[in-house]
Amino acid sequence: MLIFPINTFCQNINSYNINAILNSEDKTLTVSQIMKFKNTSNISLNKIVLEDWANSYVDNRTSLAKRISDEYSRSFTFATKKQRGSTQIKSITSNNIESWNKSEKTSDIINIYLKKELKIGESIEIEINYQVKLPDSKFTGYGFDNNNYYLKNWIIVFSNISGSDWYSQSNLNLNDQSLKKSIYKMKISFDKEYYLFSNLTINKTELLTNTKSVYLSGSDINDVKIDLLIDQNYRKFKNINNEIETDIFKTSSVKEAAKKVKRVNDFVKDYFNDNSDLKLLVAKSDYELNPFYGLNQLPSFISPFSDKFLEEIVFLKSFMINYLHQKLNLNRRESHWVYKGLEIFIIDKYINDFYPKVRFIGQLAGINILKNYEISKMNFNDLFLNYSEYVQRLNLHQADDQSSEYLTRINHDIASPYHSGVGLKYLENLIGENNLKDLILKISSIDSREDLNNLFLNYQKSDLNWFIEDYIGNRQSIDLKLKRINKNEILIEEKNNISIPYSIGYLKNDSIIQTIDFEEYKKIKIPNIDFDYIVINPKISLPELNKSNNWIYNNSNLKPLKIKFI
């Protein structure tokens, strides 16, 4: 029995009315659901596509199972039936359904065939009853873990549609389900000893003898996150129109944590000029699925950063993951570089503003044996550029605009996010902060890869073709080269025929005395000024395969010696 009248739903977007009951004995959710879909595509539809990601755990033949196996993990291959998840559909009904079936190619896509076409602007209401067997959370981070439940991607939902194409995306353990923003109204019942935390708003709680029922709702929601925990691990922080629940701050006092949450929230929302209401569940597990590379490789007894600093940047990264997923409407699989690049770009800006003196190796930079090495002078944010270049030198990198299902794990988690983030920083330096903000604001209002590319390719204030075609869309590494022709001229080349705007700087006593911007490779006349050496891109650097040819000393063929190691 459903708990909200369906006619209270908004008429312009998809909506879900859900009644779910958790059985903690057999780790199942029994679900009754009414879902309403509006045809916002550009064609009449003869079928509706649903995504049933809970069923991606059913056996070793699913796309998820193959993905986990391809990443050299045998945990799923040898999992017991009790550890795996599945969906048992009991009924799918509507006055306009001819038939339905599971996709032949994958077990987590459902095709519903209609009796008559659903015209543009028309809606269909579907009632579905099913039971979800929750998986062990060790596979993807979602499901059951001892006595706790981490619920995400368990609801059968409408696949997104852009133009005339259904996404029809299977679960590949990429945390990238891309759904249309929808209205959710839910009643979920469970054993009374559990605490519930969610990105939905809790409207009411009913206590019975042995169970608890919680009524939740939310508008403009991309996906639903619910944690059911034995312990009250989350802290709640409220501002004027924001509510954030997080389990990250364990060392910081409540007052310190509230200050940091407000600072991160205000910084991000100010940058995006966002005054909307916000309800986020910012979990440490979101960070652990994609941590800062390098920090997670350190053994627990080595801690170059204070616990309070680590808590703040872990919260910042997890906040950005959840915030961008909620605010952007692009296909997260096709356009992953936008989500991951913006995440790294904002983190870089935040650390530059509030922690500009924090070093790449933290407190280890003060150890005498390391003081004379370049690594001790590198800032924390330098890790994004350095790890991006590191993967390029290993020749393991892939193009950023390649759909994430084809990226290797090192590219998905490290190289592509860092490369994209550094690229946005470089772009901001070229076109200015306000122009980049305006560009990002426009990105938040589009939902297709074609529109995204056109936004850059048709940009009026500057030629940004290079960014999409040569930087994001090209696997070939950049290699700018500075060559002295004679006493008065230099030549700038790009050895791999990649078109990238650049600047030339003249330095004296390690200070920049003049920079000139260029958009083409050519001979350049050296100005009549007193300088020590010439350098390509002295302010903001791009990932390059070889930077040893980016310098020329004025009075010597020697170049500044840099010793770097990862």
Task: Give residue spans per PLM region.
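Acidic/His/Gly-enriched intrinsically disordered linker/tail segments
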Residues: 334, 340-422
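Juxtacatalytic substrate-recognition/specificity segment
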Residues: 186, 235-338, 342-350, 544
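Solvent-exposed beta-strand/loop surfaces of large extracellular or lumenal domains
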Residues: 58-114, 137-142, 201-209, 281, ...
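Beta-strand-rich binding/interaction modules
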Residues: 197, 280, 435, 464-467, ...
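Ligand-binding face of N-terminal immunoglobulin V-set domains in extracellular IgSF glycoproteins
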Residues: 28-62, 67-75
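Amphipathic alpha-helical substructures
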Residues: 404-485
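Extended, low-hydrophobicity, Ser/Thr/Pro/Gly-biased non-transmembrane segments
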Residues: 72-91, 104, 108, 127-227, ...
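N-terminal, polar/Ser/Thr-rich
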Residues: 9-30, 42, 155, 465-466
